[in-house]
Amino acid sequence: MALPPTFLDELRARTPLAAIIGRRMRLARSGRQWKGCCPFHGEKTPSFYVYDDHFHCFGCGAHGDAIGFVMQSQGAAFMEAVEQLASEAGMDVPKPTPEAAEAERVRHNLGSALQAAEQAFQRRLFLPEGRNARDYLLNRGLTEDTIRRFGLGWSGEGRGALASELGKDGIEQGLLIEAGLMQHNPDTGRTNDLFFNRVMFPIRDRRGRTISFGGRIMGDGQPKYVNGPETAVFSKRRNLYGADLAREGVRKGATLVVVEGYMDVIALHQAGFDGAVAPLGTALTEDQLTELWRMSPMPVLCFDGDPAGQRAAARAAELSLPLLSPDKSLKLATIAGGDDPDSLIRKQGKAGFQAVLDAAQPLADALYELLRQASGDTTPELRAAFRTRLEE
């Protein structure tokens, strides 16, 4: 039976791969990963590596995820492996129902529409109509390779142009509304493009699938940024901008760093900080913290040094406190002088931001400093009280 990809994604995310594999073989830490002697071929020198979401043997080529490991190591069928892991994760394997099949059909169709829209936006960016948007991105210091890597595009002027273009491929207006690309006004009876006169930023899930968009207006209009609405494939609370690229970067040794905006993420990746991600126009959520900890045991939160950025840092720190454990913590880094990561890199280059990361503080120290600054009182008694609260 075919299982919904969303269920399989959640099962893989909830399954601690190193713990599953560690039951059958001895593993040792190797940087951010684990390694051991491959269970699938005889070897004396470890060449079997376990990452957050897959294993790979550089000796025999064995490769797979948690489901694949159970199948290969136990000779289990696919469904047997899924049922075993789901039971351990406290998940129910979905039964084949007409409703489940319809929900999966909807998700598939939304994915197709979003992918087609991304391609259309990218084409427009490199047509004459997208010249101003392209110049804007280049003037912000982005290279053409970076623009293409992140799939940046140009919405066009709206007026139904997207529906007209995608309609040629059989994508109907109703599907574009469901995908968060158009909106219907019941008062006027008109359906309009959600994004127009905006630079487009595809939002991708952790597996690299386009699930929504953010759009930045050209010029000084408001709102500066618009994000797509909640849909069957997109949740602002659960997803992180840049997570697909950051997962690979962190796997290769990059620091996982959380910044505030799309351009911050892109500028950091271009400068070589391949673990950069950002929340999607909202304060950091518990779901996003969980996603961060799936990638790294100690992400660095790096918010702007202005009052709004410091409030965001304090809220994120407060949210994380009940969730901390020996293998799940945070660091906080602050950019002084009113800069953000994007502007800091343009002024000082890679070294400027590296200095910020190097100065990142463990959560307790950083939160203590935030509380001290907020209080305006620096007496020894108050400092001791703050420290006691943080260590409770």
What spans do the regions from the language model cover?
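N-terminal structured subdomain of primase-like DNA metabolism proteins
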Residues: 1-101, 157, 163
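Amphipathic alpha-helical transducer elements in NTP-driven molecular machines
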Residues: 14, 18, 75-82, 107-114, ...
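Phosphate-handling DNA/RNA-contact segment within nucleic-acid enzymes
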Residues: 30, 102-117, 130, 156-295, ...
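Conserved active-site segments centered on acidic
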Residues: 80-135
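Arginine/glycine-rich "motif VI" loop of SF2 helicases in the C-terminal RecA-like domain
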Residues: 319-327
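C-terminal or mid-to-C-terminal helical accessory/interaction module adjacent to the motor/catalytic core
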Residues: 327-392
